[in-house]
Amino acid sequence: MSFINNILKVFVGDKSQKDVKAIQPIIAKIRTLENSLSNLSHDELRAKTVYFKDIIKQARAEKDTKIENLKLEVEAIQDIDAREDVYAQIDILEKEAYEISEKTLNEILPEAFAVIKETAKRFKENKQITVTATAKDRELSATKSYINLVGDTAVWANSWSAAGKEITWDMIHYDVQLIGGVVLHQGKISEMQTGEGKTLVATLPLYLNALTGNGVHLVTVNDYLAKRDSAWKAPLFEFHGLMVDCIDLHQPNSDARRKAYDADITYGTNNEFGFDYLRDNMAHSPEDLVQRKHNFAIVDEVDSVLIDDARTPLIISGQVVDGDRHEFTELKPKIENLVNIQRQLANGFLTEAKRLIKEGNTKDGGFQLLRAHRALPKNKALIKFLSEEGIKALLQKTENQYMSDNNREMPKVDEALYFVIEEKNNQVELTDSGIEIMSKDTEDTFFVLPDIGTEIARIEKLNLSTEEQGEQKEKLFQDFSVKSERIHTLTQLLKAYTLFEKDTEYVLMDNKVMIVDEQTGRIMDGRRYSDGLHQAIEAKENVKIEDATQTYATVTLQNYFRMYSKLAGMTGTAVTEAGELWEIYKLDVVEIPTNRGMSRIDKEDLIYRSVREKFNAVIEDVVGLSQSGRPVLIGTTSVEISELLSRMLKMRNIPHNVLNAKMHKQEAQIVEEAGKPGVVTIATNMAGRGTDIKLTAEVKAAGGLAIIGTERHDSRRVDRQLRGRAGRQGDPGSSQFYVSLEDNLMRLFGSDRVAKIMDRMGLQEGEVIQHSMMTKSIERAQKKVEENNFGTRKRLLEYDDVMNSQREVVYKRRRHALHGERLKLDIANMMYDTCEVIVEKNKLTGDFKNFEFELIKNLSITSPVTQADFAKLSDIELTGKTYKAASEYYTEKNIRDAHEAFPIIRNVYENPGNSFERIIVPFTDGIKSLNVVTDLKKAYESQGKQLVADFEKNITLAIVDDAWKKHLRKMDEMKQSVQLAVHEQKDPLLIYKFEAFKLFKNMLDGINKEVISFLFKGDLPQQQNNIQEATQIRQKENYIESKDEILNIEEQAERNHEAGQTQQHQVTETIVRDMPKINRNDTVKIQNVANGQIEELKFKKAEILLNAGTWVLVSE
């Protein structure tokens, strides 16, 4: 592939060279401007910022004036359609004003970049900078120790504290950093090697884009970097009167956090930006909002956020009522027993396989070997045996033989097992023998799901009364629900015991199960495995099993960052994923040349047969390198391997530091020491990324930092990150990867070819192979994994895009309700849509009586047309007349409500004994009641109109939030059930899109009807004593924030199979699904989603079935 790329470069040219060449004229302009700026005084240099802001303001002044005039104009417009037109004009003008701002920023870019470079230069060359004190200087001096006021002057020091460490400014931007800054401003990804100063590069586009006053966000992967970088770079911006803050320094939903977002430049972690967005979209008052519009974001380590985190959405959830009902503790002893029995069985198969293979009987030996592998693939003895000559090849040959013809022969292998593990797909399945063992000491059908269709047919043949039939069916559905949940719990426990290992996939800290990020080796604080798996691991580890939760709000980081008008990113390793970043995010990757040439030596991989040989060789190499005075950084892929190597080094009396998920708080300190002579540091999966390892002159003379990789990662990019720790800024260094046939990557994807070559060469234990051909073979295996992962991520994003478009609609409606500006327009549209639904439904059946009934029921109005007109008029004409009548009634009702409420409000307001600021007013529609909080003074001054407006806002928010919560649950259920379409040769994504649209339309229709019905029927209290003081505007709810793991398509489909059912996968959380209001004794029709069978029974009996999710209500 590299050969083809080289040929293409000859004919087409090198993309990175072309990109850099296109930017060179801008760099030349910056260099020209530097000389003129160096002659300016400090005050004149600072005045440039005010000058730039004025240019931007004047460029967009015409558009801004028009926008302000239209906003004033719209307040006086009563006609809803005219209002909608004005709001559309405002939106267009705002877009045009943004484009003018961007054009102006491009024009002032060279001078603005030159200003920041000159500022950096002056801070480096002067211990103190004395300027005329401004109001901003005086404000900052109260909290910043590096600014001192002396009379009318402000003295800025060039030393300050960043993340607890005293630093003296010593950096000036290189030309390559100016190129990186231009790339970031253009909304692209700047790939710069480690040590090339990405943090300093960001100061250029941050300053330029902050000049608009719309806010700029710098996003980091952890809070240490966010706090450190914001403190480290702040004086550079504050010197020019720009405010800098970090959201991670302040509590969520606080005034301080809102102030941080109001700053010109805001630093923070990706998670906190995302969670703040979700919290804002659960707020019930504009005062609770913290974020502004999403203007421009620069994402540090952009590959980590947009690629590694692609399967982890941010979730805000709340506890489920009865959500703690699980059988993990009860079923755990059974699973432990089953796993122990299978372990003995697997060891027996392995012993037998070894004997048969030794005797030359490879056919039967291969059969027993395959059994041992499908019983326990992570068995250490099995992994060691597979590294021996020819054994891995025999296993794969046998597996291919039994998997041929759609796994036709595989049951012969599995019949002796109690459960089967397919490690590649992360799946475990109980066999009949396993169910038999599990069912000991229980009834025979303890783990067997009843066949609903057959059982219902049997009950109906029993000549029972309707009541008795209903009771029998109710028992059947309860039995089905309990058992399907039990089987799911069982499967998750089995996974916890066989596929998830402590100190590899997770660690135990403070008696809690904490997930370890496989990409970075850091703890994913607050993240839980979904679907009961986390609870299963908690049961396995004997810690408290946390309650099940229900999703209230969710967003993927990818879709959050796509909301920004402009997005850019920085990383040292993106070029291997350039195709994915362009295809999914339309982000171009530009490779920035290094300031100095690279002198690191990257050696070919050393390949061993077994892990033991590999680790022994690693330790020997580390001892030699350390004794020669070179610092050594050992990269591992898990906490377990880190601790193993640590024990081996202790045995050799080699002092060392360990940096992994358990020690992430000491990260920066350990990384800083990693460049000292002879220091050995073990780091799990690039923990410590983002902190420089600086080398002394002594270390450089000895050969620089030595990187030792103990295993190849699934992704070439992560290996490049590890290599990139050495050789920064032209420093010497070396990198060497050690690989064994027992490593995960080799075991699952790449070892057959390598094993054959090693067998052919007759390599004995302890001998090693090192050749460029072998390294390329390993990289091909990595590429295969990357392609699989890309496919999965792209597919997941396509699913999330469906949810994202729905989220935008719902959150837009929430925002309108929250701010109130466009709420009247939304209510008018809801009113029209409700009228349209009522007309269409009844016009289709020609049912005038029901049309009249629905108008009274939902809108409290009588029909505006006669029966003859109803039959004669078209749907559009009828909807128009109905809407006009409803609108007139609603306007009159609002005037009446305000008029009736005002005397009560006046009495409360004018009562000298009351000092209320806010009051609670209860509203009711006869069924539900809602407490509306309103500002007493505003309600009094508007003569009751403010109360009506608050009523509209509160009811809209309450109903939208409730409907959205239920909709999220339904979407989750549907995403799992549509995967079964693959069995019918249909694309699940297309079905998901179609069904999601139907679900969403139904939800919106439901919201419209419910909101309008309450607004039309909601009555004010007639008594003053119903009104109370609102001491707290809103009770803060106990939400849980987490990052969750999205499963790929195969895993979801397997889940359905595990539970022994095909349409509905039962999750441990039991949420009551949304249904129309029906009396319990009403007769309803329901349909089985699996076989289409229709039943007619009383709603109280049907409700259990509907809750189980295997049946749906059939609308008449």
From Swiss-Prot:
Binding residue positions for ATP: 177, 195-199, 692
Main enzyme class: translocase
Coiled-coil regions listed in the entry: none
Annotated GO CC locations: cell envelope Sec protein transport complex; cytosol; plasma membrane
Localization of this protein: Cell inner membrane; Cytoplasm
GO molecular function term, any single one: protein-exporting ATPase activity
Gene3D superfamilies from the UniProt entry: Helical scaffold and wing domains of SecA, P-loop containing nucleotide triphosphate hydrolases, SecA, preprotein cross-linking domain
Catalytic activities: ATP + H2O + cellular proteinSide 1 = ADP + phosphate + cellular proteinSide 2
GO BP field: intracellular protein transmembrane transport; protein import; protein targeting; protein transport by the Sec complex
Membrane topology: Peripheral membrane protein
Keyword Ribosomal protein: no
This enzyme's EC code(s): 7.4.2.8
UniProt xrefs under InterPro entries: Helicase_ATP-bd, Helicase_C-like, P-loop_NTPase, SecA, SecA_CS, SecA_DEAD, SecA_motor_DEAD, SecA_preprotein_X-link_dom
Keywords per UniProt: ATP-binding, Cell inner membrane, Cell membrane, Cytoplasm, Membrane, Nucleotide-binding, Protein transport, Translocase, Translocation, Transport
Family note: Belongs to the SecA family.
Subunit structure of this chain's protein: Monomer and homodimer. Part of the essential Sec protein translocation apparatus which comprises SecA, SecYEG and auxiliary proteins SecDF. Other proteins may also be involved.
Function summary: Part of the Sec protein translocase complex. Interacts with the SecYEG preprotein conducting channel. Has a central role in coupling the hydrolysis of ATP to the transfer of proteins into and across the cell membrane, serving as an ATP-driven molecular motor driving the stepwise translocation of polypeptide chains across the membrane.
Name of the protein in question: Protein translocase subunit SecA
